[in-house]
UniProtKB/Swiss-Prot annotation:
GO molecular function (one): ATP binding
Keyword Ligase applies: yes
Similarity comment text for this entry: Belongs to the D-alanine--D-alanine ligase family.
Signal peptide annotation: none
Pathways per UniProt: Cell wall biogenesis; peptidoglycan biosynthesis
Species in which this protein is naturally found: Pasteurella multocida (strain Pm70)
Binding site for ATP: 136-191
Annotated gene: ddl
Protein name (database record): D-alanine--D-alanine ligase
Amino acid sequence: MKKTLKQEKIAVLLGGTSAEREVSLDSGQAVLNALLSAGFDAHPIDPKTFPVATLKEQGFDRVFNILHGRGGEDGTMQGLLEQIGIPYTGCGVMTSALTMDKMRTKMLWKAFGLPVAEMEIVTKANVGELNPSAVVEKLGLPVMVKPSLEGSSVGLTKVKRVEDLKSAVDFALKYDDTVLIEEWLSGAEFTVPVLDNEVLPSIRIVPEGEFYDYEAKYISDNTQYFCPSGLSAEREDELKQLVKQAYDVVGCRGWSRIDVMLDGNDAFRLVEVNTNPGMTSHSLFPKSAATVGYSFEQLVVKILELSAE
């Protein structure tokens, strides 16, 4: 007899060791509370202190993975869970590893003809050859400089003068060996959740500062979010189709959230994928899901159920 989900022992993986540990602890607590109140046998498991490889021996049947960032969202945890044979929520090994790398994600989208920002790539190895004026000639000013791998907008700089480019690149290289210099996308910013292959309503993000950084994302109360986003039905539809293509190209499953921006000509450009979106009280995925009738608890249960398919 196969157990029902309610009979299974469920590990909520939270915390971890990445730069986004605190956010994951918040998300994990919210997810845990939702599962408990829905009648599931759920337990908090922090890989920082608990050996995840022993989950099966400890009687766990399934994982709700709400780790954010490296070690939890980059394919390593997914690979470990595949090895020990425990089903888990969200994307698999390949997609998790790929989407953690902004550069390679964008290159794949570009190869499939999907729109992304123009960019230059700098590595620790070739930073000595960086020619700021040539970069600015190609991309214009301002530009956005960011580490390829770190999540939660750590290490970002908006560069407005060619003289400031080198120091911004050096700053980003503290967080990663590969840095992207991208053309500045001056239009509105959107984030679009996908749940079980259904694209949910987009959310428009209006940060208080010039871009959506760690402060705006997690600390500031002045970042504004609009859902519905204010796009015309036609443009919302265009955005939905683009996001679904982007989701499919990188091989997402279960749930993910895709960030998109408008450029100066009002054209959509894909930015990145979050394979384990935040699930705190003010997170964006639940905000959007609420507009189509999901309570937070229903959303959490749905994500868990998708891991069983």
